[in-house]
Amino acid sequence: MMNAIPVKPTGTRWTDNQWKSIYAKGQDILVAAAAGSGKTAVLVERIIQRIIRDEIDVDKLLVVTFTNASAREMKQRVDQRIQEASIENPDNAHLKNQRVKIHQAQISTLHSFCLKLIQQHYDVLDIDPNFRTSSEAENILLLEQTIDEVLERHYDILDPHFIDLTEQLSSDRNDDQLRNTIKEMYYFSVANPNPLNWLQHLSTPYEDESQQETLFNLLNDLAMIFMNSALEALNKSYDLFMMLEEVDKQVAVLDKERRFLAEAMEGGLLNTQKIAEHQFESRFPAKNKKIKEANEMMIDAYDDGKKHYDDYKALVSKVQEDYFSREAADLKTDMQRLAPRVAYLAQVTADVIEQFNQKKRSRNLLDFSDYEHFALRILMDSNGNPSEIADMYRKQFEEILVDEYQDTNRVQEKIIACIKRGDEADGNLFMVGDVKQSIYKFRQADPSLFIGKYNRFTLDGSEHGMRIDLSQNFRSREEVLTTTNYLFKHMMDEAVGEIVYDDAAQLYYGAPFDHKPHDVQLNMLIEDASSDLNGSEQEAEYIVQQVEKIMSQHEIYDIKTEQYRKPSYKDIVILERSYGQARKIQQAFKDHNIPFHVNSKEGYFEQTEVQLILSFLRTIDNPLQDIYLVGLMRSVIYQFTEDELSNIRVFSPNDDYFYQSIKHYMANDVANKKLVAKLASFLEDIEQYQDYSQSHPVYQLIDKFYNDHYVIQYFSGIIGGKGRRANLYGLFNKAVEFENSSFRGLYQFIRFIDELIERGKDFGEENIVGPNDDVVRMMTIHSSKGLEFPFVIYSGLSRKFRRDDLHRPVILNQSYGLGMAYYDVESNLSYPSLSSVTYKAIAEKEMVSEEMRLIYVALTRAKEQLFLIGRVKDEKTLSQFEQVSVSESHLPVSYRITAQRPIDMIYPILAKYQSSSLPNELRFEQTIEDVDQAMRPYVQLNTDFYEDIASETVTDVSEQRTVADIEMNHSKNEALQAQIHNQLSYEYPYQSAIEKPSKQSVSELKRQHETEQSDTNYDRVRQYRIGSTSYERPAFLSRSKQRKANEIGTLMHTVMQHLPFNKDRLTEEDVNRLVDHLIAQHIIPEDAKQDIRFDDIYNFIASDLYQLIAESDEIYRELPFVVNQNEVDHNKHSEEDASIIQGMIDLIFVKEGQYYFVDYKTDAFNRRRNMSDEEIGAQLRERYKVQMNHYRNTLETILKTDVKGFLYFFKFGQLSIEG
């Protein structure tokens, strides 16, 4: 039963839910702590209050953290708070005792707690108390050795089921696939409380028809997601083609597909036979002549209809290929055939577990998995119930507090369950975590444990346990939070993401930043196919440019001083999913002389200096390995040239090994004497090192090679010397660590290295950069978890998700078991089984869910500003993103499951919000009002072409040409001039069809209206419109001191765009500071001050309109729009081709639900003698009547509500615009 929570005093820094998290007790409590919500501070404060307020000894609390570093930090924080409390209450004996007991406090990782448990109760386990923890190298080699021996034993027995298994999972060359499968099954099984029991039940679904039926229903539900999307796409296609004429062939194809879907989906259960046998038309009928010559709207309708058909076809094909390439009966039949193989594979893995454990016991070794399983053996009796020792710990610990609970696995959950008190309704377990940041499934973390409690527990604690949501974020600016919220509102739900992103899950702004806008930047790079750089290299250059912009144009707000400062390189971090592109990014920063560091866990073995030493070690172990032998000879140590190596090979081209060729060359009388001497010296070296390796450990062999050839000195003296030296010492230290294990010798060390390389597990380059070094850092999203940075560049959004696990021969799932295809030994063909297709479908959904959570972690690292970097091959891809359909306020489930990259989800969501031209069915919301303030994204979508970026860094040769050069060139190209003249003089035969423009700005409509009233020919207006296009002024003109009127107008609009609206009005000093800031940020030119009309701005600040805006509820600036003119004119049924109206509204504000727009005018006008203000106002209203009407009608069309407006003339004042 929940105990009373003390009343929160006024003025406390804790939020209501933080306060509740600190003091609630009496039942199990789950704190769902969103990113940046201060969970660590809350956890420490809870511990302190349990000690001070409840007078619980600190050693009566068990605090479990995810890492040793977190445990150390938490213990230090608790110790510091106890000291502070002791100083405040010097006579408090309880606090004095805690100063002593803090050193025995159980604040540690669960592994550390398990280790202590084993050390205290080793007698229960019947193990030697002098055990030691195995090293990584030792564990890897010992497991490899165990698998070798177990497989050898089964090869001797040659059971028929084992033969079938090896036929399925081995190749003609080796059984690596079988070995890797056994290893994966080993790691999966030991993540369960009872590994052997888990293995034993793997074959049950293959034998039990009721479980097979359950699997089929699960697969049917997953496939139905795609079939429903296919039905929707087909209906859209059908509706569009039914609008067109002379498309009978196309409609016939669609009718056939509609009949197929009706039969395949009848009754809600998919007809797998129909799906498996269905064949599409080989080609969709092409457009006929009439369609090709139809108007643009009809052609667009045809193209859209064809696209929907293609989408339909892709969705059904997905179901055919991945789910039901065979009908249900066949899928189930092969399950029965697979049962013996699965059972035998499970038995082989069980044999590996048993023998691996025996090997570890004989060496008196324990690994981290043993920690957990031995702890369970201590805490559970033979019946699986808590033991007497577990009861003892239940009585000892008043409360168990678990940090990062979302990363718990099933074994750890069982350990905690053994030592906690009571049930969920009256327990003493306090858990903190965020399932949206559960990104360690590859370590067997099980987010379903968190999700289960999240769904069971209630906010009032009336049933089961209590759930408390910490949603207020104290890390990031509002723009980061609201944009993240908006993305995940439309991206994450129970279907994909495994949790609903609702009001409870979203982030709420709580940091004391100022209100200067810091929009999230979504920067899309369009690749240049003609560039010498590939797409990844172009993106690396794009990232460098972004860093340069941050350094030159941005500032950082210091919350403590409430002042801005210039950024340093260390304020910038680049986050990527992996280190796959780290080398290219590193090279780009090197090319631009920007300090950069990547503490990569990948690429260590690819470093030149490391490859040299590994080639040396492999050659000493076995010189009959050509790649390593030749690599060593060509290295800087021995410096054999390619000509020398080719001469050696030419002498004996038929030798199997290059080592033999060396011997034969040296024995040849006509060989080059100088080269023979060089080879003799080299072989003498090799033989000496081989002799040395027989009697010395590996690390001494490496050390001798370093000293003999001055390896450290050489690599220290070249570019990147500090890092290279660290890498060489790192390899030496690994050799020392290896020799301290139970394995010895050069061969075993090389095998250890090979296993690491094969598993993709690098040592990582040695870290030579400290936290205060001023460098741009690159790290993976995983390594950034728990950290925060002022500027985050989240790049690599266009790189594909890792789907390797979906293509493994065996797919494992903690909840469902093992899925594998059926291999027919006789026909040498493989067929999908019910388990293989179902588990693959589940794995695909879980994979995308984890990738979503990685995106969430990346976005929420940013404090000041977030930059998203994507890359596409052409603009068409971006347009296609906008056309992605919408389903129940989300991207369709089928679309999300099959998403290939982060950008596939991020761009469509943000682009749809930004676009004002999409039809309603492609939008998430119809109006701005539909978006809650906490969900409203503040984002700028920027599209850049790499060719433009590249040109910025290349000197423009044309600037160096003289007038004489141009004149000379002009005289030499008369033929070319004639050709150009003919092309430019070409007259379009269908000129009348384009007299009406397809797109017009509001200003153009205004000019058209004015010319119609004055009988001006429309051709003249059109000519004027084209001729008045504004181009950037050339460099020699832009140096002119005097700006033109239109340039001053643009300058004034820019200042007004950034002008703050304060209720107590800005001072002249405030305006001057604003202008200085705009100049410093390169938003306006340095010489702008001389042309800014400050008096006009001061007058505006003093106006009633300024005050009205300042007191409004919401303000939006510089809003672009593109709308259909027929919709604005309420003429939707017009058969005429509609024009598109585009424009930019200076400002919109909302006050008490009423929308207003404001249009600033810098126009000069003549005040005639004796004209009153009313007459001038009427004249100005008339002049801008058309433009303002279009603004108002456009906004009313978009917002679906009444809109009023104001014209503000800097030389006159405000004029209201109403309907």
UniProtKB/Swiss-Prot annotation:
CDD domains found in the cross-reference section: DEXQc_UvrD
SUPFAM superfamilies attached to this UniProt entry: P-loop containing nucleoside triphosphate hydrolases (SSF52540), Restriction endonuclease-like (SSF52980)
Basic and acidic residues composition bias: residue spans: 1004-1016
Ranges for region Disordered: 997-1016
Locate the coiled-coil region(s) and give their ranges.
none
A Pfam family per the record: PDDEXK_1
The reaction(s) catalysed by this protein are:
Couples ATP hydrolysis with the unwinding of duplex DNA by translocating in the 3'-5' direction; ATP + H2O = ADP + phosphate + H(+)
Q: Which cofactor does it need?
A: Mg(2+)
**What does UniProt give as GO cellular component?**
cytosol; DNA helicase complex
The GO terms describing molecular function are: 3'-5' DNA helicase activity; 3'-5' exonuclease activity; ATP binding; ATP hydrolysis activity; double-stranded DNA binding
Q: Where does ATP bind?
A: A33, A34, A35, G36, S37, G38, K39, T40
Ranges for domain UvrD-like helicase C-terminal: 478-786
UniProt superkingdom: Bacteria
Q: What Enzyme Commission number(s) does the record list for this chain?
A: 3.1.-.-, 5.6.2.4
Q: Which GO terms describe its biological process?
A: double-strand break repair via homologous recombination
- Entry annotated with the keyword DNA damage: yes
Q: How does it assemble?
A: Heterodimer of AddA and AddB/RexB.
Instruction: Give the protein family.
Output: Belongs to the helicase family. AddA subfamily.
Q: What does this protein do?
A: The heterodimer acts as both an ATP-dependent DNA helicase and an ATP-dependent, dual-direction single-stranded exonuclease. Recognizes the chi site generating a DNA molecule suitable for the initiation of homologous recombination. The AddA nuclease domain is required for chi fragment generation; this subunit has the helicase and 3' -> 5' nuclease activities.
- HAMAP family recorded for this chain? AddA (MF_01451)
Its protein name is ATP-dependent helicase/nuclease subunit A
- Provenance organism: Staphylococcus saprophyticus subsp. saprophyticus (strain ATCC 15305 / DSM 20229 / NCIMB 8711 / NCTC 7292 / S-41)
Q: Which gene is annotated as encoding this protein in its UniProt record?
A: addA
